[in-house]
From Swiss-Prot:
Source species of the chain: Chelativorans sp. (strain BNC1)
UniProt-annotated stretches for the region Disordered: 1-21
Keyword Iron included in the entry's annotation: no
Entry protein name: Protein-export protein SecB
NCBIfam families referenced in this protein's UniProt entry, alphabetically: PRK05751.1-3, secB
Recorded GO MF terms: unfolded protein binding
Amino acid sequence: MADQPSGNNDAKQAETNGNTVPASLNVLTQYIKDLSFESPGAPQSLRARDKAPSININVNVNANPLGGTDYDVLLTLTAKAEADNVVLFNVELIYGGVFRIQGFPQEHMLPLLFIECPRLLFPFARQIIADATRNGGFPPLMIDPIDFARMFQQRLAEEEARRKVQVS
């Protein structure tokens, strides 16, 4: 392979302590922090139904620095299924990942932590939820893809609105 000409790669490299560090985002580990499945009405709640249950899904993302360039990102998924005002199941998953992020400009850190990291975690968390509901006697709950960029923008807008209220 021929060497590529070197150019200004600001998007891929940033100055860190006077040294040029290639920008990288690495998953160091992934883990289940908490998993809970409840089917309070079993076995009656497992019977066949004429209509699909209503399912409410909530998603949350949190990130915490671990020191240096390492961050712990937590993706929380909760789902509650109800039919005829009876809870069929509740499932909650807190799925974490430890990420090493280096070489990116500071203004890229929040989008990386709240968009890219959960985007990498989501397929694994989705499968855990599907397996938990299937193992609980229900059809697997296949959560639709999540737009983490939109969630992040909404979060920023909510924080800005709170700041404006506090200043008033």
